[in-house]
Curated annotation (Swiss-Prot):
Residues 1-44 are annotated as: Coil 2. The keyword Cytoplasm applies. It comes from Bos taurus (Bovine). One of its GO terms (cellular component) is cytoplasm. This is Keratin, type I cytoskeletal 14. SUPFAM superfamilies: Intermediate filament protein, coiled coil region (SSF64593). The lineage of its organism: Eukaryota, Metazoa, Chordata, Craniata, Vertebrata. It holds the Pfam family Filament. It is found in: Cytoplasm; Nucleus. One of its GO terms (molecular function) is structural molecule activity. Residues 47-93 are annotated as: Interaction with Type I keratins and keratin filaments.
Length: 93
């Protein structure tokens, strides 16, 4: 009947709304994490620049830096997290 179809559509819309909210939350968290990494990288770049300027009158010295990249995968199905995986890769420049 029409009423059953309407109820089914409402249920599906509510489920999609919940999935949207979860995905929006994940997106917001990832954007915050990206902003944090950008600030860290900018701070690292500023630190390296000031180290190079201050070492101009000294004998040459090695400046080494490293970078850490964290990749996080979150698989959400029907509004539930079904799989998460995190990988950290460190590189020396």
């Amino acid at each position: 009947s029409v009423e059953e179809q309407l109820a089914q559509l409402r249920c599906e819309m509510e489920q999609q709304n919940q999935e949207y909210k979860i995905l929006l939350d994940v997106k917001t968290r990832l954007e915050q994490e990206i902003a944090t990494y950008r600030r860290l990288l900018e701070g690292e770049d500023a630190h390296l620049s000031s180290s190079q300027f201050s070492s101009g009158s000294q004998s040459s010295r090695d400046v080494s830096s490293s970078r850490q990249v964290r990749t996080k995968v979150v698989d959400v199905h029907d509004g539930k997290v079904v799989f998460t995986h995190e990988q950290i890769v460190r590189t020396k420049n």
